[in-house]
Protein backbone atom coordinates (compact mmCIF):
# COMPACT_ATOMS: atom_id res chain seq x y z
CA UNK A 1 0.00 0.00 0.00
CA UNK A 2 1.37 3.40 -0.96
CA UNK A 3 2.06 5.89 1.78
CA UNK A 4 -0.66 8.48 2.36
CA UNK A 5 0.02 11.86 0.89
CA UNK A 6 0.36 14.78 3.30
CA UNK A 7 -2.62 17.18 3.42
CA UNK A 8 -2.50 19.92 0.85
CA UNK A 9 -1.53 23.33 2.14
CA UNK A 10 -4.49 25.63 2.62
CA UNK A 11 -4.79 28.66 0.37
CA UNK A 12 -5.85 31.96 1.86
CA UNK A 13 -7.80 34.95 0.59
CA UNK A 14 -6.75 38.57 1.07
CA UNK A 15 -8.64 38.77 4.39
CA UNK A 16 -6.82 35.82 5.91
CA UNK A 17 -9.62 33.25 5.60
CA UNK A 18 -8.81 29.83 4.16
CA UNK A 19 -10.45 29.38 0.75
CA UNK A 20 -11.49 25.89 1.86
CA UNK A 21 -13.84 27.56 4.37
CA UNK A 22 -15.57 29.45 1.55
CA UNK A 23 -15.91 26.21 -0.36
CA UNK A 24 -17.54 24.46 2.60
CA UNK A 25 -19.90 27.38 3.23
CA UNK A 26 -20.98 27.45 -0.42
CA UNK A 27 -21.58 23.71 -0.39
CA UNK A 28 -23.76 24.06 2.70
CA UNK A 29 -25.82 26.77 1.01
CA UNK A 30 -26.46 24.82 -2.18
CA UNK A 31 -29.58 22.99 -0.93
CA UNK A 32 -31.15 26.29 0.20
CA UNK A 33 -30.30 27.95 -3.10
CA UNK A 34 -31.85 25.04 -4.94
CA UNK A 35 -35.07 25.41 -2.93
CA UNK A 36 -35.23 29.12 -3.71
CA UNK A 37 -35.04 28.32 -7.40
CA UNK A 38 -37.88 25.82 -7.34
CA UNK A 39 -40.97 26.68 -9.30
CA UNK A 40 -44.26 25.54 -7.82
CA UNK A 41 -46.81 24.98 -10.58
CA UNK A 42 -50.36 26.31 -10.43
CA UNK A 43 -52.84 23.58 -11.28
CA UNK A 44 -55.83 24.35 -13.46
CA UNK A 45 -59.38 23.24 -12.78
CA UNK A 46 -62.88 23.30 -14.22
CA UNK A 47 -66.15 23.90 -12.39
CA UNK A 48 -68.34 20.82 -12.70
CA UNK A 49 -71.39 21.99 -10.76
CA UNK A 50 -72.52 24.46 -8.12
CA UNK A 51 -74.64 23.87 -5.02
CA UNK A 52 -76.38 26.31 -2.65
CA UNK A 53 -74.57 27.40 0.51
CA UNK A 54 -75.91 29.18 3.58
CA UNK A 55 -74.72 32.79 3.41
CA UNK A 56 -74.92 33.00 7.20
CA UNK A 57 -72.43 30.12 7.59
CA UNK A 58 -68.96 31.43 8.47
CA UNK A 59 -67.33 28.21 7.27
CA UNK A 60 -64.46 26.90 9.39
CA UNK A 61 -64.54 23.19 8.55
CA UNK A 62 -66.08 20.99 5.85
CA UNK A 63 -66.12 17.31 4.95
CA UNK A 64 -68.22 14.89 2.89
CA UNK A 65 -69.55 11.60 4.22
CA UNK A 66 -72.21 9.19 2.97
CA UNK A 67 -73.94 11.61 0.65
CA UNK A 68 -73.96 14.63 2.97
CA UNK A 69 -71.76 17.56 3.84
CA UNK A 70 -70.77 18.25 7.42
CA UNK A 71 -69.87 21.86 8.16
CA UNK A 72 -68.60 23.77 11.17
CA UNK A 73 -69.20 27.49 11.48
CA UNK A 74 -67.39 30.11 13.52
CA UNK A 75 -67.94 33.44 15.26
CA UNK A 76 -68.90 33.82 18.89
CA UNK A 77 -72.52 33.00 19.53
CA UNK A 78 -72.97 31.67 15.99
CA UNK A 79 -70.64 28.66 16.02
CA UNK A 80 -72.12 25.25 15.23
CA UNK A 81 -71.60 21.86 13.65
CA UNK A 82 -74.19 20.78 11.13
CA UNK A 83 -75.18 18.04 8.70
CA UNK A 84 -76.21 19.54 5.36
CA UNK A 85 -78.06 18.27 2.30
CA UNK A 86 -75.61 18.86 -0.55
CA UNK A 87 -78.20 19.41 -3.28
CA UNK A 88 -80.50 21.79 -1.43
CA UNK A 89 -78.26 23.33 1.24
CA UNK A 90 -80.83 22.44 3.89
CA UNK A 91 -79.45 21.98 7.40
CA UNK A 92 -80.63 18.52 8.49
CA UNK A 93 -79.05 18.45 11.97
CA UNK A 94 -77.26 21.07 14.03
CA UNK A 95 -75.44 21.31 17.35
CA UNK A 96 -74.62 24.82 18.55
CA UNK A 97 -71.24 25.57 20.11
CA UNK A 98 -71.86 27.62 23.27
CA UNK A 99 -69.95 30.85 24.05
CA UNK A 100 -67.21 31.54 24.88
CA UNK A 101 -66.14 28.88 22.38
CA UNK A 102 -65.43 29.85 18.77
CA UNK A 103 -65.97 26.82 16.55
CA UNK A 104 -63.26 25.72 14.15
CA UNK A 105 -62.39 22.62 12.08
CA UNK A 106 -64.12 19.23 12.17
CA UNK A 107 -63.41 15.64 11.16
CA UNK A 108 -65.22 12.31 11.43
CA UNK A 109 -63.54 9.29 13.00
CA UNK A 110 -65.63 6.12 13.17
CA UNK A 111 -68.80 7.04 15.11
CA UNK A 112 -67.49 10.40 16.36
CA UNK A 113 -67.42 13.93 15.01
CA UNK A 114 -64.50 15.91 16.44
CA UNK A 115 -64.47 19.71 16.58
CA UNK A 116 -61.73 22.21 17.43
CA UNK A 117 -62.19 25.67 18.89
CA UNK A 118 -60.02 28.66 18.09
CA UNK A 119 -58.22 29.99 21.16
CA UNK A 120 -59.92 28.09 23.97
CA UNK A 121 -57.58 25.07 23.77
CA UNK A 122 -60.68 22.90 24.01
CA UNK A 123 -62.19 20.47 21.56
CA UNK A 124 -65.56 18.75 21.50
CA UNK A 125 -66.54 15.22 20.52
CA UNK A 126 -70.06 14.51 19.23
CA UNK A 127 -71.96 11.40 18.26
CA UNK A 128 -71.70 11.34 14.47
CA UNK A 129 -75.23 10.00 13.94
CA UNK A 130 -77.07 12.42 16.24
CA UNK A 131 -74.59 15.29 16.88
CA UNK A 132 -75.24 14.82 20.58
CA UNK A 133 -72.26 15.97 22.71
CA UNK A 134 -70.10 13.17 24.11
CA UNK A 135 -66.94 14.50 25.67
CA UNK A 136 -64.24 17.17 25.52
CA UNK A 137 -60.46 17.22 25.08
CA UNK A 138 -57.66 19.76 25.38
CA UNK A 139 -54.64 20.78 23.33
CA UNK A 140 -52.04 23.55 23.31
CA UNK A 141 -52.11 26.60 21.09
CA UNK A 142 -54.84 27.46 18.62
CA UNK A 143 -57.14 25.10 16.75
CA UNK A 144 -57.87 25.82 13.07
CA UNK A 145 -58.67 22.69 11.06
CA UNK A 146 -58.83 18.89 11.04
CA UNK A 147 -58.72 16.08 8.49
CA UNK A 148 -57.70 12.42 8.50
CA UNK A 149 -56.30 9.54 6.51
CA UNK A 150 -57.02 5.93 7.49
CA UNK A 151 -54.52 5.99 10.40
CA UNK A 152 -54.37 9.41 12.02
CA UNK A 153 -55.75 12.92 12.23
CA UNK A 154 -54.09 16.08 10.93
CA UNK A 155 -54.57 19.43 12.65
CA UNK A 156 -53.62 22.96 11.57
CA UNK A 157 -53.13 25.82 14.02
CA UNK A 158 -52.47 28.82 11.79
CA UNK A 159 -48.72 28.26 11.60
CA UNK A 160 -46.60 26.36 9.07
CA UNK A 161 -46.89 23.22 11.19
CA UNK A 162 -49.51 20.51 10.74
CA UNK A 163 -49.87 18.30 13.80
CA UNK A 164 -50.43 14.57 13.60
CA UNK A 165 -52.88 13.29 16.23
CA UNK A 166 -53.74 9.84 17.51
CA UNK A 167 -57.43 9.44 16.56
CA UNK A 168 -58.35 7.67 19.80
CA UNK A 169 -56.55 9.73 22.45
CA UNK A 170 -56.47 12.94 20.33
CA UNK A 171 -52.92 13.52 21.60
CA UNK A 172 -50.19 14.82 19.30
CA UNK A 173 -47.90 12.11 17.92
CA UNK A 174 -45.88 14.15 15.44
CA UNK A 175 -45.89 17.12 13.09
CA UNK A 176 -45.22 18.15 9.51
CA UNK A 177 -43.33 21.36 8.72
CA UNK A 178 -44.84 22.80 5.54
CA UNK A 179 -42.61 24.75 3.18
CA UNK A 180 -43.00 26.50 -0.16
CA UNK A 181 -39.74 27.00 -2.05
CA UNK A 182 -37.82 26.22 1.12
CA UNK A 183 -39.63 28.77 3.30
CA UNK A 184 -42.26 28.03 5.98
CA UNK A 185 -45.83 28.44 4.74
CA UNK A 186 -47.81 30.07 7.54
CA UNK A 187 -51.58 30.56 7.86
CA UNK A 188 -52.51 27.00 6.94
CA UNK A 189 -56.23 26.74 7.51
CA UNK A 190 -58.90 24.25 6.36
CA UNK A 191 -57.51 20.81 5.50
CA UNK A 192 -58.57 17.83 3.41
CA UNK A 193 -56.91 14.49 2.68
CA UNK A 194 -57.11 13.80 -1.07
CA UNK A 195 -55.42 10.88 -2.83
CA UNK A 196 -52.49 10.68 -0.43
CA UNK A 197 -51.92 14.43 -0.22
CA UNK A 198 -52.95 17.20 2.15
CA UNK A 199 -54.87 20.09 0.66
CA UNK A 200 -54.84 23.28 2.72
CA UNK A 201 -56.50 26.65 2.35
CA UNK A 202 -54.01 29.45 2.98
CA UNK A 203 -55.88 31.99 5.11
CA UNK A 204 -56.69 35.36 3.50
CA UNK A 205 -55.61 34.13 0.06
CA UNK A 206 -57.40 32.52 -2.87
CA UNK A 207 -54.98 29.59 -2.94
CA UNK A 208 -55.10 25.98 -1.87
CA UNK A 209 -51.74 24.29 -1.30
CA UNK A 210 -51.21 20.67 -2.34
CA UNK A 211 -48.80 19.31 0.27
CA UNK A 212 -46.66 16.17 0.25
CA UNK A 213 -47.33 14.76 3.75
CA UNK A 214 -43.93 13.04 3.87
CA UNK A 215 -41.68 15.99 2.98
CA UNK A 216 -44.03 18.84 3.88
CA UNK A 217 -43.29 20.51 0.54
CA UNK A 218 -45.95 22.36 -1.41
CA UNK A 219 -46.04 20.54 -4.75
CA UNK A 220 -48.69 22.68 -6.47
CA UNK A 221 -51.04 25.60 -5.98
CA UNK A 222 -54.72 25.68 -6.86
CA UNK A 223 -55.72 29.31 -7.32
CA UNK A 224 -59.48 29.81 -6.99
CA UNK A 225 -59.52 33.58 -7.47
CA UNK A 226 -62.11 33.23 -10.24
CA UNK A 227 -64.61 31.71 -7.78
CA UNK A 228 -64.54 34.55 -5.25
CA UNK A 229 -67.94 36.28 -5.14
CA UNK A 230 -68.34 39.96 -6.00
CA UNK A 231 -67.26 41.85 -2.85
CA UNK A 232 -70.47 43.89 -2.99
CA UNK A 233 -72.46 40.70 -2.36
CA UNK A 234 -70.48 39.64 0.72
CA UNK A 235 -71.25 40.55 4.34
CA UNK A 236 -67.59 41.29 5.11
CA UNK A 237 -65.33 41.07 2.03
CA UNK A 238 -62.16 41.21 4.13
CA UNK A 239 -63.03 38.15 6.20
CA UNK A 240 -65.44 36.24 3.94
CA UNK A 241 -62.57 34.40 2.31
CA UNK A 242 -62.02 31.07 0.62
CA UNK A 243 -62.23 28.35 3.27
CA UNK A 244 -63.70 24.88 3.06
CA UNK A 245 -62.55 21.75 1.21
CA UNK A 246 -64.42 18.45 1.07
CA UNK A 247 -63.71 15.30 -0.93
CA UNK A 248 -66.01 12.49 -2.02
CA UNK A 249 -63.49 9.68 -2.52
CA UNK A 250 -66.02 7.19 -3.88
CA UNK A 251 -67.01 9.42 -6.80
CA UNK A 252 -63.79 11.49 -6.98
CA UNK A 253 -65.57 14.79 -6.36
CA UNK A 254 -63.84 17.81 -4.83
CA UNK A 255 -65.89 20.59 -3.24
CA UNK A 256 -64.75 24.08 -2.22
CA UNK A 257 -66.45 27.11 -0.71
CA UNK A 258 -65.82 30.16 1.44
CA UNK A 259 -67.05 31.91 4.56
CA UNK A 260 -70.60 33.15 3.95
CA UNK A 261 -70.31 32.39 0.23
CA UNK A 262 -73.59 31.72 -1.61
CA UNK A 263 -72.29 28.66 -3.44
CA UNK A 264 -70.32 25.46 -3.00
CA UNK A 265 -68.32 24.55 -6.09
CA UNK A 266 -67.58 21.05 -7.31
CA UNK A 267 -64.31 21.32 -9.24
CA UNK A 268 -62.23 18.93 -11.32
CA UNK A 269 -58.47 19.41 -11.20
CA UNK A 270 -56.53 19.34 -14.46
CA UNK A 271 -54.23 16.38 -14.92
Each predicted region: which residue ranges?
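A short helix->beta-strand "capping" segment at the edge of beta-propeller domains
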Residues: 38-55, 86-90
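A short beta-strand motif characteristic of beta-propeller blades
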Residues: 47-52, 90-96, 132-137, 174-182, ...
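Beta-strand-rich domains and repeat architectures in extracellular enzymes and scaffolds
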Residues: 48-80, 96, 100-107, 258-260
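Beta-rich, blade/repeat-based domains predominating
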Residues: 55-66, 99-109, 139-150, 156, ...
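Conserved beta-strand positions in repeat-built beta-propeller and related beta-rich domains
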Residues: 71-75, 113-120, 153-159, 200-204, ...
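Short loop/turn segments that connect beta-strands within beta-propeller blades
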Residues: 85-89, 127-131, 167-170, 212-216, ...
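Blade-loop segments of beta-propeller domains
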Residues: 89-124, 133-139, 143
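Hydrophobic, well-structured mid-protein blocks that either form specific transmembrane helices
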Residues: 123-181
Amino acid sequence: MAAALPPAAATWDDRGMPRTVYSLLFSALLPSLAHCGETIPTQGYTVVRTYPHDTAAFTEGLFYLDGHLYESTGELGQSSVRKVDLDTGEVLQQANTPPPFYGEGIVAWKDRLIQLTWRNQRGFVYDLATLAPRTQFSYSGEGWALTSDDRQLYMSDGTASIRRLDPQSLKQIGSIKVTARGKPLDNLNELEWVKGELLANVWLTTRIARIDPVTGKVIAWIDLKALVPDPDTLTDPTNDVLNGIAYDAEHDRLFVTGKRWPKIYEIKLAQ
